[in-house]
């Protein structure tokens, strides 16, 4: 026998050793589980019993005392705004949402948290929205950085700049009208009023004298095409194709090369394109981001790889690529066309510095998110309410018929409809019940603390005030606060109207209020005036009593089937 071989342990000894280790596996696993539980639970229990922010006295869900996972679960179930509102109705104006977070619901509280005099900064929640290393004007938590960006970008959304883009936006209203006219055409040609088919990805069916289809995708097609044209000089082409897709470069690298203005690479960057379902990508990313945003930072990457979050996790690089491709296309065109990106390219901060590549891209991504989804959501919800109540629709159409009498264009001119009292009331009521974001966005109480509703909140406490609940305060809006009633804006006394306006914040308030307010209001006026002057809309007989929503970050309608007919 070889001497080296004799040094090896006998085979039987090895087998016995392995069997011994195998018998220890349950014990090892038990120890690991205990260690993980200790690491996870101990800080939770310590925070609860130590109560560093002195929030134990405030009511709220039992689990919210121990962990932020409660609110993440509610968000993942698409019940964010409505659940927090229910908590306030049950427990009062101050509700605890997590170990360090309280929600405060009143007009005074909203102003205290978000107003110009508030020293509160955005919470770590916003870190989850960072898809680039450089933050956007929305997700930056640094006050000085936000001020710098606001100075650069404010002119882009000024009323004068928005008016200059009206003719560009009009093109997409015209395409929407043309497509809806095409859908309505079979109603006059069918035998016994029945036919069905598809236009792009949209199924339609004629029943009686109306064509029935889901209008929600159309509002998204319109908003995505509008913002991509206004921002980057060309539409995504969703309206024409009736399809929620966009084309991106097959690699971020090629988009970056084009944006860097190295023209030797620009053709290469445009040659290999990939079609992505942009509307789905945006929805998946927002749902994923908000569901994880309240969890500890170290947990987020782990949860992001779970099967239930996989689509959202994969959506982040796709949306980044979409913004990079949009910027690349615009820069490679070398046009002097006036649009939002040209404003960003010309913009300079107080030191005379322009935006760099990554900063352009992160702001472009924000334009796609804000412009592609938010106005579409409010438009669809408002159309749902109008289609549900034919008396409201008749009043609106009577006002529009007078205002647009003699107007030859298929699209309502903004100047003709911007000051119509009943249209204004309808839009305000739509924004009240379906503001872009219903949940309270979190802020961190600054040094020295903050007093809200007579209660002192310690420095570092996270505080939010929900728009959804603010807009349904019965003390301000009356017993019918949960109902769509445009007349409330016309019937209120001067004092009541003043109180209503103090409790009306669809675009938030203060230094972090939405810069796109003027654009959104212009688009809502033109869209709703154009649609309801040209068409009659009704809901199905078995339509749900409430519009089905994905109530996560944005309150997104899931579906809205309407019966559409051209008006005589």
Swiss-Prot record:
InterPro entries to which the protein is assigned, alphabetical: Cyt_P450, Cyt_P450_CS, Cyt_P450_E_grp-I, Cyt_P450_sf, Cytochrome_P450_monoxygenase
Annotated positions binding heme: 514
GO CC entries: membrane
Pathways involved: Secondary metabolite biosynthesis
Residues listed as glycosylation sites in the UniProt record: 321, 377
Superkingdom in the source lineage: Eukaryota
Keywords: Glycoprotein, Heme, Iron, Membrane, Metal-binding, Monooxygenase, Oxidoreductase, Transmembrane, Transmembrane helix
Subcellular location: Membrane
Broad class of enzyme this protein falls into: oxidoreductase
Cofactor: heme
Enzyme nomenclature, EC number: 1.-.-.-
Molecular function GO terms recorded: heme binding; iron ion binding; monooxygenase activity; oxidoreductase activity, acting on paired donors, with incorporation or reduction of molecular oxygen
Topology within the bilayer: Single-pass membrane protein
Claim: Metal-binding is one of the keywords in the record: yes
Bilayer-spanning residue ranges: 21-41
Physiological role: Cytochrome P450 monooxygenase that is able to use 3,5-dimethoxy-trans-stilbene and 3,5,4'-trimethoxy-trans-stilbene as substrates for oxidation.
Homology family: Belongs to the cytochrome P450 family.
Protein's name in the database: Cytochrome P450 monooxygenase 41
Source organism of this protein record: Postia placenta (strain ATCC 44394 / Madison 698-R) (Brown rot fungus)
Encoding gene, per UniProt annotation: CYP041
